[in-house]
């Protein structure tokens, strides 16, 4: 060991002969897996040494100790029990770490020197398939990114389903949006990657050698995987930058899985013009699957996701994060949801699908030959539901429903095989035995009879020996340490025949063995070992019998997941009173009585629904009103309703007519980006620049309080210029919320703009927010009243009122003047009285009357 290694305790890189044979074996295996933690099997433990031990001790909160010496220095060591390994691996995966599992593969009885060991699996965050290591309702993706100097190539793979997608684009903003959308558990990048500032801080980062991104290598690997001569049939042949990323992905997955990947059967190019594009800021601000605090409560998916299966839940989240523009597909989803509601099928479908479970990931483990016995029982249970699902779907004549019915095939032969082959409730692992059902294989039955027949045979031996020895208390027994034995009390030991051989002495008893019992023991133990070996072979044959059907099984699983999502959306529409939006070709967003899908679920009072009308002659709304008045909610609900329409779902509104949308942008709220050294204002301007550079006439843009982070005149000027650009040059559908009342003049100066405001009623020092959108500009911002509601001291509010009066009167008070007297407030009538005086009862619908009643109650 070098001086450096002696000082640090790290594993040496040369001169293995100085180490013990066991450590030589370890160091050789570690050299093959230098960058990941190596769990080295030693008896009932997995042990880690040197730097791996130190790192594991910190990450897993396990003790760091020493294991003797090798090459003259102590060996740092940490370990975990073999039966608890899955829990520790799960923690490592969550932390973005990888691990290599090294098992004993040789026979200790015949080994000369250390028992042969080898790495049998490598666990990485993006390639795990074990059920215990995955979040069942979240996709677990591995991704690779490459830049060729002109454009980015980006690829994602889901080992748990076999989905494999690539994409290429030119802008860094698109890379950020893709990373936000796909959220890979592991990200591969080349050594020369110069955009690390976009990925730094992510877990699961892996730097890979340049050769893994070579185009020729990528084409060869992919053609080998798919069994084709070229990639033309997949439509990706010309996407060379993306193929470089795909090649690295395939190489890495093959290296880590160390087995064939039959469930990865194609690669698809994602077309940006097929989707409604959302950047990273938009996904964050709309709180689609993650709220602003990083949790999952009070998000769109939390409201929408009542799916029956984990694979359905994952598909729904993919739909939410990638709304589409193809109206044929969207209208097909809408009509299917309508059919499931009208035929009242969604509830019964949900009950059946709950019994299907997560077939998608079971099939992935089957493809990787890592399926466990209970995976096969889950498949059997799923197969058993399919005939009833087919019968239920046959009740509908709807074309799309029948297409789903055809795709969700039944597999009676496989169901019969699994029913005959697998125990009702098998053990977790095949190594425990007892997986194959009695009667499936005659040879296995005979071996089991021999192994399990010990009870009757031992009873006969026991009865005979009692008669021969005259010892009525003589017993024949068995334990794992000493095997079979004849037990005699100490008091009767003098009656034992001479051919009895003492095996064990206890406090009150003696235990013996005889030749016949020893031979029987050998026979039984041999039968048990043979039965277990045969059972393992039969289990592998079961997997072999299932694998040829993998493609059909995957197609059926995909149909079941889609059916689950559509049935779930039907249930949500009925339960939450959503309506089917009308998708049109004209430039219009017309929503009657729209509601925020999340906010209305967390409110105790009824949600105040609001309309919106955007069209060619009215493309921008300047929104004014008090803080807390509901401007941001109104803007977000519009975006969410448009998004829901573009996943084919029903929407929270009385009606909606929605024209083509290509992008959704939001510039709502901001905070300092301390890691990048950017102020709140800089973050705001960066997001604004992205909108102004990329929005089109068919984009939906939400702009909230542009220009707040700088001086009043700078902010007003920027807000004015941004509004003009969006309205006159770009022509995007725009909701522009502002506190700059000067902007309310824009509709007088330009076509296509309109003022709306959210109403509030003031009474004395209090304010009641109506949350109702009205035409025209707000008369004031009510900032002082909101400050009072927030608990700002009354003396400060009083001083602010005086200063406001001065500013509005343009008569500033000289510096150093004494404290001003309170500004007298004009007598005001009660707001409830004002509201009632304006009501025309005969013109109110029952719904409007109920809403009015709740508003009046809020004002008291």
UniProtKB/Swiss-Prot annotation:
> Its GO biological process terms?
mismatch repair
Q: Matching SMART domains, A to Z?
A: MUTSac, MUTSd
Query: What span is annotated as the signal peptide, if there is one?
Result: none
Keyword check for ATP-binding:
yes
Q: Which UniProt keywords apply?
A: ATP-binding, DNA damage, DNA repair, DNA-binding, Nucleotide-binding
InterPro entries recorded: DNA_mismatch_repair_MutS, DNA_mismatch_repair_MutS-lik_N, DNA_mismatch_repair_MutS/MSH, DNA_mismatch_repair_MutS_C, DNA_mismatch_repair_MutS_clamp, DNA_mismatch_repair_MutS_core, DNA_mismatch_repair_MutS_N, DNA_mismatch_repair_MutS_sf
Q: Which GO terms describe its cellular component?
A: cytosol
Coiled-coil ranges per UniProt: none
Keyword Nucleotide-binding recorded: yes
Q: Which GO terms describe its molecular function?
A: ATP binding; ATP-dependent DNA damage sensor activity; damaged DNA binding; mismatched DNA binding
Q: Which SUPFAM superfamilies match?
A: DNA repair protein MutS, domain I, DNA repair protein MutS, domain II, DNA repair protein MutS, domain III, P-loop containing nucleoside triphosphate hydrolases
Q: Where does ATP bind?
A: 625-632
Family statement:
Belongs to the DNA mismatch repair MutS family.
Record-linked HAMAP family: MutS (MF_00096)
Protein task: This protein is involved in the repair of mismatches in DNA. It is possible that it carries out the mismatch recognition step. This protein has a weak ATPase activity.
Q: Which PANTHER family match?
A: DNA MISMATCH REPAIR PROTEIN MSH1, MITOCHONDRIAL (PTHR11361:SF34), DNA MISMATCH REPAIR PROTEIN MUTS FAMILY MEMBER (PTHR11361)
This protein's name: DNA mismatch repair protein MutS
């Amino acid at each position: 060991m070098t001086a450096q290694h002696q000082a640090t305790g790290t594993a040496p890189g040369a001169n293995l002969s100085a180490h013990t044979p066991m450590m030589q074996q370890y160091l050789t295996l570690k050299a093959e897996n230098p960058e990941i933690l190596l769990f080295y099997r030693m008896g009932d433990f997995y042990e880690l040494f040197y730097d791996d031990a130190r790192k594991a001790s910190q990450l897993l909160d396990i003790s760091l100790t020493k294991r003797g010496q090798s090459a003259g220095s102590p060996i740092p060591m940490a370990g975990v029990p073999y039966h608890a390994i899955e829990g520790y691996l799960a923690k490592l995966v969550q932390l973005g770490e990888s691990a290599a599992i090294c098992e004993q593969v040789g026979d200790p009885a015949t080994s000369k020197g250390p028992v042969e060991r080898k790495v049998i699996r490598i666990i990485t965050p993006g390639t795990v398939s074990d059920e215990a290591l995955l979040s069942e309702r979240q996709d677990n993706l591995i991704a690779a990114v490459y830049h060729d100097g002109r454009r980015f190539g980006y690829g994602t793979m889901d080992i748990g389903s076999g989905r494999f997608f690539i994409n290429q684009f030119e802008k860094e903003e698109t890379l950020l949006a893709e990373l936000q959308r796909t959220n890979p558990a592991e990200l591969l990048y080349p050594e020369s990657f110069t955009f690390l500032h976009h990925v730094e801080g992510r877990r699961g980062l892996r730097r890979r050698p340049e050769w893994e991104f070579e185009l020729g290598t990528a084409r060869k690997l992919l053609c080998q995987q798919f069994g084709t001569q070229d990639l033309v049939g997949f439509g990706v042949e010309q996407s060379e930058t993306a193929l470089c990323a795909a090649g690295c992905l395939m190489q890495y997955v093959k290296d880590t899985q160390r087995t064939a990947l039959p469930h990865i059967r194609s690669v698809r190019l994602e077309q940006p013009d097929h989707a409604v594009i959302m950047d990273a800021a938009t996904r964050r601000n709309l709180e689609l699957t993650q709220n602003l605090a990083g949790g999952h409560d009070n998000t769109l998916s939390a409201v929408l996701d009542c799916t029956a299966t984990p694979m359905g839940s994952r598909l729904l989240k993919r739909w939410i994060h990638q709304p589409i523009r193809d109206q044929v597909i969207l209208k097909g989803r809408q009509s299917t949801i309508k059919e499931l509601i009208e035929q009242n099928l969604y509830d019964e479908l949900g009950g059946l699908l709950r019994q299907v479970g997560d077939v998608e990931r079971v099939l992935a483990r089957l493809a990787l030959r890592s399926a466990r016995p209970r995976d096969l029982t889950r498949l059997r249970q799923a197969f058993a539901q399919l005939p009833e699902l087919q019968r239920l779907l046959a009740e509908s004549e709807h074309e799309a429903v029948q297409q789903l019915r055809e795709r969700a095939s039944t597999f009676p032969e496989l169901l019969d095989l699994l029913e005959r082959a697998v125990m009702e409730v098998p053990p977790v692992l095949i190594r425990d035995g007892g997986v194959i059902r009695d009667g499936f294989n005659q040879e296995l039955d005979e071996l089991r009879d021999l192994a399990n027949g010990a009870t009757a045979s031992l009873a006969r031996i026991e009865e005979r020996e009692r008669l021969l020895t005259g010892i009525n208390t003589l017993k024949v027994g068995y334990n794992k340490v000493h095997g079979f034995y004849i037990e005699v009390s100490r008091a009767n030991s003098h009656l034992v025949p001479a051919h009895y051989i003492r095996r064990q002495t206890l406090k009150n008893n003696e235990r013996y063995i005889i030749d016949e019992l020893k031979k029987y023991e050998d026979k039984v133990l041999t039968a048990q070992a043979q039965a277990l070996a045969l059972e393992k072979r039969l289990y592998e044959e079961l997997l072999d019998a299932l694998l040829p059907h993998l493609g059909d099984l995957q197609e059926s699983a995909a149909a079941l997941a889609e059916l689950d999502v559509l049935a779930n959306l039907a249930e949500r529409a009925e339960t939450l009173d959503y309506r089917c939006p009308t998708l049109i070709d004209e430039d219009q967003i017309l929503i009657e009585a729209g509601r925020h899908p999340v906010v209305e679920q967390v409110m105790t009072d009824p949600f105040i629904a609001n309309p919106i009308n955007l069209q060619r002659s009215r493309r921008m709304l300047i929104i004014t009103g008090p803080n807390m008045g509901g401007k941001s909610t109104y803007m977000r609900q519009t975006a969410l309703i448009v998004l829901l329409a573009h996943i084919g779902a029903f929407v929270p509104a009385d009606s909606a007519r929605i024209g083509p949308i290509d992008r959704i942008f939001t510039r709502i709220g901001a905070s300092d980006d301390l890691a990048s050294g950017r102020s709140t204002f800089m973050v705001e301007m960066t997001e604004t620049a992205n909108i102004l550079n990329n929005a089109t006439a068919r984009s939906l843009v939400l702009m909230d309080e542009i220009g707040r982070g700088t001086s009043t005149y700078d902010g007003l000027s920027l807000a004015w210029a941004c509004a003009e650009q969006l309205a006159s040059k770009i022509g995007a559908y725009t909701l522009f919320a502002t506190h700059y009342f000067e902007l309310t003049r824009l509709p007088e100066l330009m076509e296509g703009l309109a003022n709306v405001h959210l109403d509030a009623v003031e009474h004395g020092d209090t304010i009641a927010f109506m949350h109702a959108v009205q035409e025209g500009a707000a008369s004031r911002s009510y900032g002082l009243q909101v400050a009072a509601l927030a608990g700002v001291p009354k003396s400060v509010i009083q001083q602010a009122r005086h200063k406001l009066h001065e500013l509005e009167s343009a008569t500033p008070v000289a510096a150093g003047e004494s404290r001003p007297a309170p500004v007298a407030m004009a007598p005001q009538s009660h707001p409830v009285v004002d509201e009632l005086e304006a009501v025309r009862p005969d013109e109110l619908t029952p719904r409007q009357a109920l809403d009015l009643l709740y508003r009046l109650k809020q004002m008291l």
